């Protein structure tokens, strides 16, 4: 009897090809499509950039499932998504941090709520179109390093990895699109999602206004304490940001955000580099020694740097072997040994 796999089918090319590859390997596939926010969000807004989980994605996912003759289930996760992802996003922003909701969506929603539904339906495995690899119960980067998504999957608990299949991890994005073309999948050339599903076009101001969250303006000050302008609200800025709307006579970058005083500290470029950080809320994949060397990635588009790590049981004390720009509280740090993911956590 063939193993049963629940494929997280978004309506994009990656998950469509993952579904196709698993069918070709002889698995018995069921498609699971999740709805994170109400369709009205996409209907009432003029959205410029592609986002996931929209009504058009649902339509595409239905067509893909129909083409391959597999059962199709829509899973409504709006309530748990609001509780675990949107509310977290708001609270972290109000605390002066820069959160990464996609990281936690993979843990709580895709490989949490939806995975639980699929397994309770009798699925043996859950699969997605993510670019990463799981080998012998361990998480690794994809072979295509440009498209690798192990950074975002490093929130998934270790014990779940044995139940997850990532067929795309062995292929390049170009090859995935070629496979889609040859298989006659209609979304072969569909563009990738660019923005957060609940925050189209990164319209932060409308997002907070619509939820009745009052964002107060405040002062922009230099490291010496001189007021040089006004900011529109702390959530609209992040560490390392340069476009501040103030004329200072030199290039200044956001160095810190002070929630109590509601002010932003700016400084020249060299002052925004750090030599160390602390990381909490750990998700650990291997037995960590008290001290170890690794490379660390501190945001999506970031060149990893080597570091020395001290494991203090509930947190990591990280010493960079070279200065790092814009270490941002609330963002995710993922630690690697070559291609293997060692652990992850939230930057303090």
Swiss-Prot record:
Q: Known InterPro entries for this protein?
A: MnmA-like (IPR004506), MnmA-like_C (IPR046885), MnmA-like_central (IPR046884), MnmA-like_central_sf (IPR023382), Rossmann-like_a/b/a_fold (IPR014729)
Q: Gene name?
A: mnmA
Q: Which GO MF terms does the UniProt record name?
A: ATP binding; tRNA binding; tRNA-uridine 2-sulfurtransferase activity
Q: What is this protein called?
A: tRNA-specific 2-thiouridylase MnmA
Reported EC number(s) for this entry are 2.8.1.13
Residues covered by region (Interaction with tRNA):
147-149
Query: What organism is the protein native to?
Result: Fervidobacterium nodosum (strain ATCC 35602 / DSM 5306 / Rt17-B1)
Q: Which PANTHER family does the UniProt entry name for this protein?
A: MITOCHONDRIAL TRNA-SPECIFIC 2-THIOURIDYLASE 1, TRNA 5-METHYLAMINOMETHYL-2-THIOURIDYLATE -METHYLTRANSFERASE
The positions annotated as site (Interaction with tRNA) read 130, 331
Say what the protein does: Catalyzes the 2-thiolation of uridine at the wobble position (U34) of tRNA, leading to the formation of s(2)U34.
Q: What is its main location?
A: cytoplasm
Tell me where in or outside the cell this protein is found.
Cytoplasm
Any one cellular component term from GO for this entry?
A: cytoplasm
Lineage, broadest ranks? Bacteria, Thermotogati, Thermotogota, Thermotogae, Thermotogales
């Amino acid at each position: 009897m063939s193993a049963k796999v629940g494929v997280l089918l978004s309506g994009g090319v990656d998950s469509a090809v993952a579904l196709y590859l698993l069918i070709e390997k002889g698995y018995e596939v069921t498609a699971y499509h999740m709805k994170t926010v109400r369709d009205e969000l996409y209907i009432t807004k003029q959205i410029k950039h592609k986002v996931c989980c929209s009504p058009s994605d649902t339509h595409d996912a239905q067509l893909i499932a129909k083409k391959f003759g597999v059962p199709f289930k829509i899973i409504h996760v709006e309530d748990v998504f609001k509780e675990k992802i949107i509310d977290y996003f708001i609270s972290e922003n109000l605390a002066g941090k820069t959160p990464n909701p996609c990281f936690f969506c993979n843990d709580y929603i895709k490989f949490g709520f939806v995975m639980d539904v699929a397994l309770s339906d009798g699925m043996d495995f859950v699969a997605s179109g993510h670019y990463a690899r799981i080998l012998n119960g361990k998480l690794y980067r994809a072979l295509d390093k440009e498209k690798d998504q192990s950074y975002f999957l490093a929130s998934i608990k270790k014990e779940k990895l044995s139940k997850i299949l990532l067929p795309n991890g062995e292929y390049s994005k170009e090859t995935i699109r070629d496979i889609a073309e040859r298989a006659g999948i209609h979304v072969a050339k569909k563009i990738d999602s660019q923005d957060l599903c609940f925050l189209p076009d990164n319209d932060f101001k409308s997002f907070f206004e619509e939820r009745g969250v009052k964002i107060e303006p405040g002062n922009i000050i230099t490291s010496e304490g001189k007021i040089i302008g006004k900011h529109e609200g702390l959530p609209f800025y992040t560490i390392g940001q340069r476009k501040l709307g103030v004329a200072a006579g030199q290039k200044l970058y956001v160095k810190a955000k002070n929630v109590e005083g509601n002010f932003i500290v700016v400084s020249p470029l060299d002052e925004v580099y750090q030599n160390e950080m602390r990381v909490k809320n750990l998700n650990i994949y291997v037995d960590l020694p008290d001290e170890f060397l690794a490379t660390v990635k501190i945001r999506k588009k970031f060149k990893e740097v080597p570091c020395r790590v001290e494991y203090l049981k509930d947190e990591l004390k990280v010493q960079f072997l070279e200065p790092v720009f814009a270490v941002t509280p609330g963002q995710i740090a993922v630690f690697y040994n070559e291609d293997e993911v060692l652990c992850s956590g939230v930057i303090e």
